[in-house]
């Protein structure tokens, strides 16, 4: 009967402490088969062993859960822990004995060891195995890349949270990661924004010269050499749902047509679609990030629309003003059939300001008459009214009433003549 009772006590001790049979027999015999005292002494020795520092070197990478060495190993003076062969841990089911309830499981590892934990379902995890497989913990977030462990930059980070019976995986969006990397690369190779050249504070007049006839004078070669190409500015705005170029439409990150564009931006290169025809013109690209979705801007309203009309102009003349004003000022229509300019004879230029706002510049000989000038105007406006007057530019204006008077006699050589109805 005593043997059966001792056997039950040994089994209960093993179920509570997960120790070996030899250890259970040793502690029970030391306490005259008092189970409570034997378990208390066993756990106290376990806590004392855990509090002792390890002066010889780093602890083994993994430890067992409530495990114990055999007496032949733990009490032998030649025994040293092995890093390559950790003692196996024992998982057990709930003890049927009611006396096992007050006791819990404790780790046998040292204070500095990488400890394994065991949840009630028997699933174990270890820091030494945190990189095994695809399982990662929150401790990996604080680990720097200098540990020599490569990370796949093409895969999004996955975070796990939850308990024993439920869990959740959170994966960050890859496009946000790509935008972050793009901005990081842009910061590394960024250049200062070009400073606009300060304008001179001088109030002296500068500009291009023009003749009284209206013809523009080409600038001098020195001025042309001093002119530098103007810098082209582009702004690329990154939104949560895409990106825009300047004031263009929204473009998606995953669109295959935008792959080449995004690759050029990530390499800090100007995209081909933004390059000017003249390669000498510098291009500056600004990257702007907005933490919101793109919304279509309202279209600008143009409440004032219509056709300009000149005061004192007839209906037929004013109606053709928009069409006539689009013609260049220094381009004259074909001369009338009776007007022939002799290049060998003295010539002059006359600027004609018509009533509809059109400016015509034509060349005449000095022997041409005022009638020839009117014929030139009538030829340029076949459907226009011929009831008009010609006035010279000046104060007071002089009316040209003598049609047979030559240009030289009328004093309108290289002058401006105004048409008035």
From Swiss-Prot:
Transmembrane segments: none annotated. It comes from the Eukaryota. Residues 85-102, 312-328 have a biased composition (Low complexity). Keywords: Ubl conjugation pathway. Residues 69-84 have a biased composition (Polar residues). The keyword Electron transport does not apply. Residues 4-45 form the UBA domain. One of its GO terms (cellular component) is cytosol. The keyword ATP-binding does not apply. Residues 343-420 form the UBX domain. Residues 231-295 form the SEP domain. GO terms for molecular function: ATPase binding. InterPro entries: C6orf106_UBA-like, NSFL1C_SEP_dom_sf, SEP_domain, UBA-like_sf, Ubiquitin-like_domsf, UBX_dom. Residues 46-171, 292-338 are annotated as: Disordered. It holds the Pfam family SEP. Interacts with CDC48A (non-hexameric) via its UBX domain. This is Plant UBX domain-containing protein 5. The lineage of its organism: Eukaryota, Viridiplantae, Streptophyta, Embryophyta, Tracheophyta.
């Amino acid at each position: 009967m005593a043997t059966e009772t001792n056997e039950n006590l040994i089994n209960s001790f093993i179920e509570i402490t997960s120790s070996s049979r030899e250890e259970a027999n040793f502690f029970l015999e030391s306490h005259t088969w008092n189970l409570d005292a034997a378990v208390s002494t066993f756990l106290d020795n376990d806590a004392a062993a855990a509090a002792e520092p390890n002066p010889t070197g780093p602890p083994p990478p993994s430890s067992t859960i409530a495990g114990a060495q055999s007496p032949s190993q733990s009490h032998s003076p030649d025994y040293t822990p092995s890093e390559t062969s950790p003692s196996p841990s024992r998982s057990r089911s709930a003890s049927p004995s009611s006396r096992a309830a007050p006791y819990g499981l404790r780790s046998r590892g040292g204070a500095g060891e990488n400890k394994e934990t065991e949840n009630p379902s028997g699933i174990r995890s270890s820091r030494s195995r945190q990189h095994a497989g695809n399982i990662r913990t929150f401790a990996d977030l604080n680990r720097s890349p200098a540990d020599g462990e490569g990370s796949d930059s093409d895969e999004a980070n996955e975070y796990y949270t939850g308990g024993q019976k439920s869990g959740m995986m959170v994966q960050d969006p890859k496009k946000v990661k790509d935008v972050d990397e793009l901005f990081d690369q842009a910061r590394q190779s960024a250049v200062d924004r070009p400073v606009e050249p300060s304008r001179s504070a001088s109030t002296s007049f500068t500009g291009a010269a023009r003749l009284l006839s209206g013809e523009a004078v080409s600038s001098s070669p020195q001025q042309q050499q001093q002119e530098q190409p103007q810098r082209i500015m582009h702004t690329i705005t990154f939104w949560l749902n895409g990106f825009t170029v300047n004031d263009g439409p929204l473009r998606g990150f995953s669109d295959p047509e935008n792959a080449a564009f995004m690759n050029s931006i990530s390499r800090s290169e100007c995209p081909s679609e933004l390059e000017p025809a003249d390669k000498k013109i510098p291009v500056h690209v600004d990257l702007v990030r907005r933490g919101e979705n793109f919304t279509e801007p309202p279209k600008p309203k143009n409440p004032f629309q219509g056709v300009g009309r000149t005061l004192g102009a007839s209906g037929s003349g004013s109606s053709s003003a928009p069409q006539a004003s689009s013609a260049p000022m220094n381009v004259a229509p074909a001369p009338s059939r009776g007007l022939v300019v002799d290049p060998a004879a003295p010539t002059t230029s006359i600027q004609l300001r018509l009533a509809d706002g059109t400016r015509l510049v034509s060349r005449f000989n000095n022997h041409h008459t005022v009638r020839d000038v009117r014929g030139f105007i009538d030829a340029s406006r076949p459907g226009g009214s011929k009831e008009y007057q010609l006035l010279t530019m000046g104060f007071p204006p002089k009316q040209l009433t003598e049609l047979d008077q030559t240009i030289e006699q009328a004093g309108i050589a290289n002058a401006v003549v105004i048409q008035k109805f």
